[in-house]
Amino acid sequence: FARGYDTDVHGQSTYFVWNNRGKQSCTVDLKRPDDLLLFEAMLGQADVFVQNLAPGATERLGIGSKTPRKSFTRLVVCDIGGYAPGTPDAERKAYDLLIQAEAGLASVTGSATSGPSRVGISITDISTGEAAYAAILEALFRRERTGEGAHLQLSLFDTMAELMAVPYL
C-alpha cells in the first residue's frame, strides 16, 4: 500500500523510503522449495524474524514460530496478529480501522455530530509496531545475558485495548 503513493525517489514511494530507510529487502515465494531454502539460510544469519501473515499461514508453510526457534535457538521470533492466540477471535484477520472500532478508539474520536470516526493515521499498526520494537529490544538484551532467543506474540487488538485503558490506570 505505502509503496504505491508516488514514485518520486528513484521510482519508489517517498513514504515507503522514509519509513524503510537503510533496510534491504528481497521477495521469496515460501511455497517454492528453493525459496524456502533461501529463507532458512537468511534465518541462520538473522537476529530477529518478524511476521504478520494471516492467521495460520506460517504454520501451513512449515515455518511457524516454533520451527525457526528449534533450528536457530538465538533467534528472536515476533509474531504479530490481529487477536491474541487462544482467544475466540485468534483466527480472524484484522486491519487497523476494524481494531480502532472494536477497541473503542473510534467511539472517542470525532465530534458529537459526526459520531465515531477513525484516527487520521494508522494508529493501531504504528502502536503495535512500537510495542513489538520495545519487546524485541528487551528480548535481544536478554539474549545477550542468556544466549537464548525468544518467541514474542503481539496482537493489534491487545495493543489498542492497552492504549484505551491508559486513562483508567
What role is predicted for each listed range?
Residues 139-169:
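Substrate-binding/catalytic subdomain of NAD(P)-dependent oxidoreductase enzymes
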Residues 1-151:
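N-terminal helix-loop segment corresponding to the beta1-alpha1 unit
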